């Protein structure tokens, strides 16, 4: 099947924002304008499009789509139709894993900022992730009609807090109640949108007299930014004092894709002003799949390879989100990086090393879902019926195996026991938790062997609250939750040169005999567990060595101090002995386990606790109180910045997670509700002796 839209006219973008910047309204307006311009029914001549809103109303649930496809021909109908996939990115820091996931499959992003609130802490987290994945972006300053709106303040904050290089492509006409429209600095015209048509119509007008000098200053700033794209343009600019519209747009596009600049626009999504021009900006300045480097991966032999965004290349795709639809089952959203995929194909999941059959392929639109027969390079769609694929897996052609990314998911730092309220909820709860764990790799479920309780673990208190809330909302399961528990770890600090483990039972008949000598030493943080076989002369036969490693690995799950998992140790097996008749795998497994436990006791065991990076935004009057409170929680205050544009302080600190429970309540009461905070996991560090003693005592058998 031939392409309907050439890949150069594809844009895979995310709309990303802090919680209150108005992302939802902005996205809704994007879907409204693009949907009106392009009636889906016409394109496919009565192809089966199933109305998705009706289903939602019948079921009373809302399915938020992880990726929505729409088309845009330009505010003035001046472009051929562009195929835009909008990937949803959550705004909360507990879901940074979700943001990372979506950043991975984006080619560009629109960062939405509130004209009043400006750049918030979460905006910084998202910005850092966009830097990490080198995502070109443009900025849209929303809510220009709100009291206190100030476009230029946001410009200053982007420079100060994000160290960004924003280039306004527009400046506002008025602000707050008097916000009328924008000045297009490329055309040097005012754009005024028509209220009656909900912003569908607009007209170009002359720039208001009192704004002309300002507009000229900002235009010069923009043209200079464009001229820096190449020596040739710089010379042209120096000779002629200006650049043509085509030159400016091409140069701004080039520098945006190289992540050197961030074009800035503004408007108010709620009042239907500005989003239309932002969509034009997406088409004009953000990259298509072929404007960015081909996707890197590893082949079967772990050698680096790339996959070009071409239909003729071998098929490769990344699963970036699993969503559960109670009626269709699991939807797996994938981004096709290269090649083509047809419904009915069998593909290879190179992470799980299993084959998967592609059932139906569906594309989500603003108010309907459409079944498509094939996906091409650059496409994003959802697949129904995958059995083993989870977030972060690669799907590829089994004759050209590639792994696009080894997803590294953070280990959960907090856990809670959950119990169903009634017997009837018991089975439903298990099902619900497994479904939710399949969707979100940073959320884990396990059963505590001693108490038989179900334990859920995640990235923060809010993360687990939302999981419990979703169980109730989507699966109808009422549950009670226990007190949050911190995920401590254990490690050792000294080397234990030689520790012996002997497991012998020889009392007649078939006996048991296993004997090992191990060296146990600490590794640098994050290095994990390493097992080295240094047996010389067959003192432990080859066939028993895996059993020795297994014995040590099984013991790692429960440390000697308080039963927490042991991390960052290196174990070397260098000597042992065996019995021709009585030795077996089980005996060596037991001997290794005993030796490792003994060795850990002698190697100065310690407990590690998760440390969180905490950022508090507070009015200046309360800064001292906040810092004192963080210090009393064993926090290390690492610095204090001004909130850009005045209005308070940002305090950055590193605080143990165990001291942060209930922090939001105490921060609220200490600052009369005027301070906000965000926190994310930073690293594990050794707990002080008094804390270790308290943990050990609390875990001791009563």
Swiss-Prot record:
Keyword Protein biosynthesis assigned: yes
MF-aspect GO terms: GTP binding; GTPase activity; guanosine tetraphosphate binding; translation elongation factor activity
Domain tr-type G: 8-290
Gene Ontology process terms (BP): ribosome disassembly
Pfam families: EFG_C (PF00679), EFG_III (PF14492), EFG_IV (PF03764), GTP_EFTU (PF00009), GTP_EFTU_D2 (PF03144)
Family stated for the protein in its record: Belongs to the TRAFAC class translation factor GTPase superfamily. Classic translation factor GTPase family. EF-G/EF-2 subfamily.
NCBIfam families xref list: EF-G, PRK12740.1-5, small_GTP
Name of the protein in its database record: Elongation factor G
Organism (species): Janthinobacterium sp. (strain Marseille)
